[in-house]
Amino acid sequence: PRMMRTTLHSSSSLRTRWRKTSNAIMLALTGLAVLIAIVPLFWILAQVFLAGVSALNLDFFTQLPTPAGVPGGGIANALVGSIITVGLGLLIALPIGLLTGFYTATHSNRPLGLAVRFGTDVVAGVPSIVMGLFVYALIVLPQHHFSAWSGGVALAFIMLPIIIRTTEEMIRLVPSSMREGSLALGAPEWKTSLRVVLPAAWNGVLTGVMLAAARAAGEAAPMLFTAFGNPFMSTDISQPIVTLPQTVFVYAISPYPDWQAKAWASALVLIFLVLFLNVTARLIVAW
C-alpha cells in the first residue's frame, strides 16, 4: 500500500508538472503570436508618424497643392474631396443598406432573403479595384468623363455589404417581444419597424455605418477609375475630384522629395481619420 501511494503521488506530481509546463508553453506561444501581430502594426504607425509629422502645419490643411518642385502647399482639396465622395457614398448606401438589412433580418428563410445574403457575402469579398472598374464601365464611359458622384457610387458599392450585414445582425438582436407587443397594439408592420425596432438597434447600425465610412475613406483604387483627381478645389460632383488616398498614391510615386514628404503626411492624416471613425464607432457601442 505504501508503494502504491508513493507511485500514485509520483504520477500525480508528473501530471501537475506537465500541465504547468504545457500551460507555460501555450502562454509563451500566445504571447509570441500577439507580438507578431502587434509589432508590425506599431512599426508601420511609428514610421508613418516620424516621416509625416514634420510636414504637418496649418498651410498643409488649408492650402491647395503646389506644382511639382515648388515647396509649400497643402491638401485642402483632397480633404474636401474625401468628405464629398464618402458623403455621396453614404447617401446612396445608407437607405439601400438599411432596407436590405431589414428585409434579410425579417425574411431570412425566404429564397430572396437567402439570395440577398449570399450576394452580400460575395460582394463583400470583391476587390475594391473591381468595383472601380465596374463603375467606370457603368457610369464613366457612357458619360465620357470622370466625376465625384461616380466615385461616390463606387464607394457605395464598397459600403453596402458592411451596412447590410451590420443592420441584419443588429435587427436580429432586438427581442421579438418588442415587435410582437407593438403589433399586438395594432401598429402596422412598417411603423413597428420604424418606431420600435430601428431605435432599439440604432446604436449597432450606426456603428456599422461608421465602420463602412472608415473603410471607404481609405480606398484609392476605385477613385482612380471614377473620380480620377483634380489639382484644384472643386465641390462640383459632376467634375473630377481628388481624395486623400489618391493624394498619397500620386505623391508617393513622384520623384520629388517635397511631394514624398507630403505623401507621408497625407498618409498620417488618413490614418488618424480612419482611427477617429473606428474609435467613434466603438464609443457608440459602449454608450
Predicted feature locations:
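Interhelical loop and adjacent transmembrane-helix boundary motif
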Residues: 68-69, 223-271
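Glycine/proline-centered hinge or cleavage motifs at structural transition points of membrane proteins
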Residues: 127, 185-186, 199
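Hydrophobic alpha-helical transmembrane segments of multipass integral membrane proteins
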Residues: 80, 84-92, 96, 100, ...
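Transmembrane-helix boundary motif in ABC transporter permease subunits
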Residues: 89-120, 133, 281-287
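Transmembrane alpha-helices
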Residues: 189-225
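C-terminal transmembrane helix and the adjacent membrane-cytosol boundary/short C-terminal tail
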Residues: 168-172, 183, 210, 250-287
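Periplasmic/extracellular loop-to-transmembrane helix junction in inner-membrane transport proteins
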Residues: 9-32, 46-89, 109, 250-261
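Generic hydrophobic transmembrane alpha-helix motif, especially the helices
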Residues: 121-157
